[in-house]
Amino acid sequence: ILIIGEEIVPLSPFEKITLFAMKYSTFKTIMPFRSAKVTLFFLCTLISCKNNGQTQGNTSVQNTEKQTKEVVVGANRMYLYIKDLRAKNIAIVTNQTGIVKAEKGNYVHLVDTLLKKKVSISKVFAPEHGFRGEADAGEVVKDGKDTKTGLSIVSLYGKNKKPTAEQLKGVDLVLFDLQDVGVRFYTYISTLHYVMEACAEQHIPVIVLDRPNPNAHYIDGAVLQPAFKSFIGMHPVPVVYGMTIGEYAQMINGEKWLQAGVTADLKVIPLAYYTHQTSYSLPGKT
């Protein structure tokens, strides 16, 4: 065998070649040495090429990983939550921002994706602006039926902003997926509060699919005073609070802001390759 560094190479396969060269060479006295030199050089070259190939391969993989380390939203990390949805009646709180990146690179709605995966969705809870985002700011959102999926739409921006016990009847789990902007007076964090509160009261688990906060890199503005609490400001946080929707859900639980100090059975599906300094452009559905 030949040992070079960490490589161990058996020389037995080259024995016949060496003997053949020695037998038929005209340089009888020096051929064994020359043959051995050529063989050794050949083997060293092979080993060098092999090591170089491994190094280049590893570098290529690392570069590829770096290039593909784009932000992955919670909704796209289905392997972390799809098992929680099986054999259950699911209600989902979402709107037009609840999209996921498909294998072909295009974007499709989470509801369509889950239905395709045979997840039983019983209803959609619609926040301000409605399920399809067609209502104006402050416009009352009505209950109805989605024309594309046939699912029942239950408004959380109409006669009630908190799901009632009747609306949650028969629901085993609530999935929450809304893109927020990280500003206190946007109502999605208030909807999150009421959904968590209602589910805590009815002992229904909540899964929040985290999405980036485009304003997570800073905190700014005055903290809301309790005397001015309303649906456009429910919590004592700054105007720009610097948290993702998943982090905010954990804060609601941790600070015991829900009525009577209850806490929701909460699971947050985190983002991948994201920090509060990560730049992020909102995707568009194609």
Mark where each language-model region is.
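A short helix->loop->beta-strand "cap" motif at the edges of active sites that frequently abuts
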Residues: 119, 201-205
